[in-house]
Amino acid sequence: ADKLLYALRDVTATVDSIPLIASSIMSKKLASGADSIVLDVKVGSGAFMKNVDSARCLAKTMVELGRLAKKPTIATLTNMEQPLGCAIGNAIEVIEAIETLKGHGPKDFTELCIDFTTEILMVAGIEKDEKVARSMVEDAIHSGKGVEKFREMISWQGGNPNVIDDYTLFAQANEIIDLD
């Protein structure tokens, strides 16, 4: 249905309509059954929302929709004026996420993940104190609990959890073009 609505927004020149963008995003979040919602609104040249004002408006609209649905919801703005992390492409971005869970990720991506997960713990009511929540996240990375939870999540979804230990199990590109 979302694809059809996006096509309709395209032909009616309402692709940039913040209320329609917000309702599209939040309808999926609410339909998933989440108890609380933490949103990462990207802003800048590498994002759909090109300026801070429109990103802030989108964030506020989505938070209000969450409030109306009686779901604790917060939104953060992330600067996308430059790439985040070092990887570009589905498989290698997942590998970068796994490396981050193992404590070996790029500094900028690791910091964003820690900040974001700290917010999740607080919004979900797991921990009220930000310093304690952050410490819990850092401990999950350093102890290996985070990557083990990801391994469980892969299994729950019918995936092969061995990809965490053997990156060659990821699908490889059908064609590689040398640009030299």
Describe each region flagged by the PLM.
Residues 1-8:
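Self-splicing inteins and homing endonuclease
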